[in-house]
Amino acid sequence: PFSHALEKVLIPGLHHETLSLLIMEHLNEHFNGQLSTAIAIFTGTYPKPFLHQLISGQLDVDRMDYLNRDSFFTGVAEGVIGYDRILKMLTVKDGQLMVEEKAIFSIEKFLISRRLMYWQVYLHKTVVSAEMSVVLIFKRVLELLQKGVPVQAASTDLDFFLQNREAGAAIKQHLDRFCRLDDHDVMASIKNWCHHPDKVLSTLSRLVTERKLLKIRFLKEPIAASRLTELRKETALRLTISEAEAAYFVFTGKASNTTYNPKDERIHILFKDGTVKDISEVDNALINYGSSLAFGEISKEYICYPQAQ
């Protein structure tokens, strides 16, 4: 539910790709091994590496799909890429996925579009505020449950994972439960928690359901600890909660994104003479080693705090 936002909250330590593999293996047993090839491609053990690179790599079809799709639904034109040309220019050499040199500019446009979409959509300050609010709601729920305070989710499946934190270690036994979860389980629970006697939980839940999100401000430099403490004291007084509880409403964080790092996975350009270069090593490269686009994640510190009444 809620994609990556709750990934580390519902089942700590379980990456979504690990969960995907467990589901595929479960289905493979049900279909008597018919997914064995698909699993080998997914895990990168299939003898043709380019197939894995097509579904999990710098130029995988998922990235091409979500950039155009999200660009359309959000109205942010910068995410539109010429995926059809990129697909036509894809080729294979020595089992590795490569791109013909004619598509260099299309690849550079793809990388720049991804960078712009992250800062204009995925890491937009309103998105960050909403996501952090939902995460903190579940953090508070887990804290209350640990203290013995009753908190019930709107569905038995979500309730199961919140009440049984050890279930994540035995997730293979509970895949059916997990696969029944969706965004509705989460939102229905948050609506119910708007009326919970715990003030922190009910207030956070109302912020989300009523769309009165925490204000967020990106900072040029980290905020002083004394100033953060001061803001929490002010919030504690205004909401009549403790200073420790005010940390749920006044907190700092960091939004980060890396456009392209050849140390992770490379985008190989195949030239007519048969030579192969990384996209960052071509002549007059837009994505080059000296550019902030190539290396080093771009990070922005932020602070969240309640809106003035």
Residue ranges and their predicted role:
Residues 2-309:
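Histidine-centered, transition-metal-coordinating active-site segments
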